[in-house]
Each structure stands twice: as structure tokens, then as C-alpha cells.
Amino acid sequence: MHKDQIISQLIKEKIITISPDKPFTYASGMLSPIYTDLRLTVSYPDLRDMIASDLSNLIAAEFPQATIIGGVATAGIPHAALVAEKLHLPMIYVRPKPKDHGKGRQIEGRFSENDQIVLIDDLITTGGSVLNAVKATEKDGGKVAGVASIFTYYLPDAKENFKEANVKYTPLLSYPELLKKENESGHITSDQYDILKTWHEDPWAWGKKFNS
């Protein structure tokens, strides 16, 4: 596994940005002192190859029953394609909503009711987008074995949402691992470390306090 190298390159290439004084706003409305733009990883051949290799090994270990790899549009699609190639498995991808033209499909690619599908997304914050993809796949008759991602913040909301949906998810990298690496490498100050740790414990409370 290449966890340390991947995290180091994510930091080096500023794919992960830390800004405690000017926090970012996520799609959920959550304020955060950190932003992870994993869409940029496709621009770095060595990085994307390490990610694909480690994700493939992770899926083979955690979901040995997998017969199809699914990409969650849009950021999960390139990584799903690379993993499907390495595992020599068929691939599908899932849109956020059905097309409004043509055949009106939400899922592209073929699968049967006997297939075991593993969906890949780049990042899990609250889990909303990938769990919508799970619902869409199951609505079309697919069986979702679980979800894999490059990175997760391991936020309480995500844990609760996956538990409620009864969906297994396995990340390659997690926020606690990133925070530990950032702290050890000296890329962040002790004050920044404390801010990032406090945010992780209760993101909504942190955002509310920041705005007060």
C-alpha cells in the first residue's frame, strides 16, 4: 500500500487545502477549514496509479464477491475505470439523476440481478451523493456489495447515514490519518492542528461558532 506517498503528494500538489481563517462551504452547507479536491488527482499519472493500485487491493480484500465496479459521477468515474481495468471487471457508472433525453437512463453499463456491485466515489463527506447512487442502483435491480472511496472525513453524519442505509463502506485514506501526517510533517502549526481536530469532532458546531 502507498498510503504515506499518496498523502504526501496530495499535500505537495495542494490537492488538500487548509484555511482555518477563511473556511470553505461544502455542498451540504457545512463550513470547513479543509478542502479536498480529489478531482485533481487524474492530472498526476504516478499518483492516480498508486490510488488505483491501492483501491484495487482494498476492494479485492474487502469485497471479494465483487463482479462489477461502479463509478459515481463525476469524480468517481475515472478511478472506477482504472480499478475495473486492474481487476479486469466490468464497469458501470451512476449519474446524480436520469438523463432528460434519449433513453433517460441514470445508470450506464450493463449488470444483472446476480451481480455484486462495488461503487467508487472520490470523497465521502456526509455520504449523501454516493448513497443516492446506491439507491438508484438498487432501484434498477442491482445489488450493491458496498462503497469504496479514496478519502473520507469520517464525520459523524457519514457514519450515521451509512449505518441507517445498512451499506458497508471502506475508504483508502481517512481524515485522522491525514491529520496525523500533516502534524508530524510540520505542514501545520499546533494551533491549526487544534482547529482541525475540533472541527472534526463536531463540524456543525464549529461552523456555528465561527459565524458567531
From Swiss-Prot:
Q: Which domain of life is it from?
A: Bacteria
Entry-linked Gene3D superfamilies:
3.40.50.2020
Renumbered to this chain, the signal peptide range is: none
Give the record's GO biological process terms: 'de novo' UMP biosynthetic process; pyrimidine nucleobase biosynthetic process
Cofactor(s) the protein needs: Mg(2+)
Q: Name one Pfam family in it.
A: Pribosyltran
Q: InterPro entries from the entry?
A: OPRT (IPR023031), Or_phspho_trans_dom (IPR004467), PRibTrfase_dom (IPR000836), PRTase-like (IPR029057)
What pathway does this protein act in? Answer: Pyrimidine metabolism; UMP biosynthesis via de novo pathway; UMP from orotate: step 1/2
Enumerate the residues binding orotate. Answer: T125
| Reactions performed catalytically | orotidine 5'-phosphate + diphosphate = orotate + 5-phospho-alpha-D-ribose 1-diphosphate
* Keywords tagged on the record: Glycosyltransferase, Magnesium, Pyrimidine biosynthesis, Transferase
| Annotated 5-phospho-alpha-D-ribose 1-diphosphate binding sites | R95, K99, H101, D121, D122, L123, I124, T125, T126, G127, G128, S129
What Enzyme Commission number(s) appear in the record? 2.4.2.10
The keyword Transferase belongs to this UniProt entry's keyword annotation: yes
GO molecular function terms here? magnesium ion binding; orotate phosphoribosyltransferase activity
Q: How does it assemble?
A: Homodimer.
Family of this protein: Belongs to the purine/pyrimidine phosphoribosyltransferase family. PyrE subfamily.
Which NCBIfam families does the UniProt record give? pyrE
Its function, per the record, reads: Catalyzes the transfer of a ribosyl phosphate group from 5-phosphoribose 1-diphosphate to orotate, leading to the formation of orotidine monophosphate (OMP).
| The name this protein goes by in its record | Orotate phosphoribosyltransferase
Q: Source species, please?
A: Lactobacillus johnsonii (strain CNCM I-12250 / La1 / NCC 533)
Query: Lineage in the entry?
Result: Bacteria, Bacillati, Bacillota, Bacilli, Lactobacillales
